[in-house]
Amino acid sequence: MTYFFETYGCQMNVAESASVEQLLLARGWTKAVDAQTCDVLIINTCSVRITAETRVFGRLGLFSSLKKKRAFFIILMGCMAQRLHDKIQQQFPRIDYVVGTFAHARFESIFQEIEQKLTQKDYRFEFISERYREHPVSGYRFFASSYSEGSFQSFIPIMNGCNNFCSFCIVPYVRGREISRDLDAILQEVDVLSEKGVREITLLGQNVNSYRGRDREGNIVTFPQLLRHLVRRCEVKDQIKWIRFVSSHPKDLSDDLIATIAQESRLCRLVHLPVQHGANGVLKRMRRSYTREQYLSLVGKLKASVPNVALSTDILIGFPGETEEDFEQTLDLMREVEFDSAFMYHYNPREGTPAYDFPDRIPDATRIARLQRVIALQMSTTLKKMRARVGKTLPVLVESRSRNNPEELFGHTELGEMTVLEGKVDPTYIGRFVDVQVKEVRGRTLRAHLVQERAK
């Protein structure tokens, strides 16, 4: 049997696709070259923005037509499967399985059915989307591993769901309430990843700061405590050198977490701290639970406590009722903080969220124009910061040969900056940490030459 994945959306979706792929590989399945030749097509979907849903609907139309010409199975999973299951089943009856975010335990039986070549039919599981308030976490299952074969990086989901209910966000309605993974399960996955040669891990959650797992005695483990446990575990085999985490809600960024980042050298000095907006009135309507001043205070603490810390963020432009003055306050905040990078987007109405019914929607032309100004400002700041790296010696994790020149190697810095090692570089450095000296910036990539391999 052969399979192929199409994955849309966040890093959590990427991790969950990798986890499902592990189940398939364990059953002896192999990856197909493309979606047109596979026995089973798995589409992992996102509902955060309407553009992602529109693209998936287009793909479903294409693949439904393809099923008229050849027999294969289509599995739809992820947030669209949870949110729009009835619409999808009605509009695309040739889809074989629709697996929502609370139905991960179904995959083993689905794959067994496919292997037995059962007659294709509509498959419906017990959806929880309308009842998650009574059963907030009952159906969610963490996978054992999100490892991708041959990769030196790996995601580790540590929690799922969100209790914040920002007025614009669909995530709590498709992911449910927060649930945290037990400490031992996370540590066991770290051990497995170390054995497989992984050098860098990224902890995932809709709000990792609110992690509240349990140890084997049943005691609550906070997120800073989890990080310290992970660092100590990684020190044992000394294979995993860099630990990242996303995403962090500003209201839950504690002094203990800031101190932990400052004290532990394996924690990357890059913190993703979504601000969303720079005007207090908009932040209040967004239900973000902090003010502009509180956010800037957190940034000040981070910069004072963690030398050379880099900050990334999310910026949401064109929220209902946003005035020109509100927008200018966002630009001012960006200039003051000087984010190293940002995910920038304009407001997308999501049916079922409180903001969907808010008055004073911003015209499309205004939203787009404001977003372009935000992007231009951030690109200028990012370029300035990257140019400041020229001449400096930085650690880099070498990932692969360069796609443009196989004699050169490709990797990334601790801050996630793409880096090309120029000249003929020994390919045995792939999967290792090296020191490089930055020569120049091309586009959004650092060009550098090898100095030496870093001490183990």
Swiss-Prot record:
Binds 2 [4Fe-4S] clusters. One cluster is coordinated with 3 cysteines and an exchangeable S-adenosyl-L-methionine. It catalyses: N(6)-dimethylallyladenosine(37) in tRNA + (sulfur carrier)-SH + AH2 + 2 S-adenosyl-L-methionine = 2-methylsulfanyl-N(6)-dimethylallyladenosine(37) in tRNA + (sulfur carrier)-H + 5'-deoxyadenosine + L-methionine + A + S-adenosyl-L-homocysteine + 2 H(+). Its main location: cytoplasm. [4Fe-4S] cluster 2 binds at C162, C166, C169. It is found in: Cytoplasm. Residues 387-452 form the TRAM domain. Its cofactor is [4Fe-4S] cluster. Monomer. PANTHER family: CDK5 REGULATORY SUBUNIT-ASSOCIATED PROTEIN 1, MITOCHONDRIAL TRNA METHYLTHIOTRANSFERASE CDK5RAP1. Catalyzes the methylthiolation of N6-(dimethylallyl)adenosine (i(6)A), leading to the formation of 2-methylthio-N6-(dimethylallyl)adenosine (ms(2)i(6)A) at position 37 in tRNAs that read codons beginning with uridine. This is tRNA-2-methylthio-N(6)-dimethylallyladenosine synthase. It comes from Treponema pallidum (strain Nichols).
